[in-house]
Amino acid sequence: MNIPSLACCVWELTLRCNLRCLHCGATAGSARPDELTTTEALRVADELVALKANEVTLMGGEIFLRPDWPELARTLRAGGVQVVVFTNCTLITPERIAQLKALEPHTIGTSIDGGCAASHDEIRGVPRAFAKTLAAIDDLQAEGLRVGVITTLTRRNLYELPAIARLLMGRDIHWQIQAAGAGGERLARTDLLTPLEFYFAALFIARLRTTYPWAVLPVIGAHDFGYCSTRLSSLRVPGQVWTGCGAGRNTLGIQSNGSVKGCLSLPGNFVVGNVREQSLLELWEGDTFEAWRQPVTRHGFCAECPHGEACEGGCTELAVTYSGRRGDNPMCFYRIEQASLFS
C-alpha cells in the first residue's frame, strides 16, 4: 500500500465562536459538548508531528476561545510542522499578538466577506466585526506577521468583490476567494451561487490577475475554483495543474470532538473515524482513506468529460453540495463553457 504524505490538515480546535456567519459550514456558536480535552488534543498534535504533516491550519469556531491553543500550536511547531492560525480577528489583543509572534506561524488567516461594514457585518452576524478585523490586520502586519484573507462567496456578497479588491490592494495581503457550500444551517440553498454566478466570479479573478501584478494584489481562487477551462488561462497560478481533489488523499480535517474527515468542509456523513478510538496514523493508513485514494466513480457530464480521468469531478465539497455525490460537479468551468451560452 502506497501511503501518501500528509500535505495539509485543517483542525477545528473548538466550535465555540463569537460570530454567527451566515455561510458557516459548521454552524459555529456554542462549543461541541464532547470537545477534546487538552491531554487528548496534545496527543493529536504529537500524532500530526509523527505523520510528518507539512502544514496544519488551526481554527474554530474562533480559535482564541480555546485557552490551550498556544500549547497545541507550540507542540506542532516544535515538531517541525508549519502552522497557520485562522481567526476572525475580532479578539486580537497585544498579548495574543505576542503569542503569535513567538509561534512564528506561516500565516494568520482571516475573513473579509464584504467591502464595507454594512455588508461584512450582516454576513458575519455581529456589529463592528468589520472595523475590528481591519484594525487587527493593521496591528498584525505592524508586528511583521503575514496575513491572508479568505472571502467566501454567496449570492449575498458576489458583487462585493470589487470593493474588497480595492480594500486589499497594495497591502501585501494574500487573498483567496472561494464558493460557499451547503453544510451549515444558516444559509439558504437559494443563496448559493449558480453556475453562471460562479463563472462570473472566476472572470473577475482572472481579470484581476491580468490587470494587477502579484506584488499589488496577490489573489487566487481556492481549489474549488475551476478545472480545465478553455478560456480562463490566467485564473490559476502558473504551473499549477489540477489532478483531483486532495480530500482523504493528501489532506484531512479534524473536528473539535476528534471526528476525522478527508476535508473539514465535508458534511457529517463523511466522517471516517475518531481519534479517541483510533490514532491518526491508523486512520491515515487504514482501509477507509485507502478507498478515497482510488479513482473516483464519475457520473453525469463528468463521466464522459475528456478531462474526467485527471480531474475526477473536481472539489468534493462542491460536487456533494450541488449534485449530492462525488464525481459529478456542476461547478466546473469546462462544463459551464460547453453549455449553449458559450457555444
Put a short name on every predicted segment.
Residues M1-T107:
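Conserved alpha-helical substructure of the radical SAM core
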Residues T14, G29, E62, C89-T90, ...:
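Short beta->alpha junction loops/turns
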Residues R20, C24, R66, E95, ...:
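Residues that scaffold the ATP/ADP-binding catalytic core of kinase and kinase-like folds
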Residues L36, A102-H106, S111-D113, A118-A247, ...:
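Radical SAM enzyme [4Fe-4S]-AdoMet core and its adjacent flexible, acidic
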Residues A41, F198-A201, L280:
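Hydrophobic/aromatic residues in well-formed alpha-helices
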Residues E47-G60, N329-S343:
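Short Fe-S-cluster ligation motifs
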Residues I173, H223-S340:
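Accessory C-terminal segments flanking Radical SAM cores
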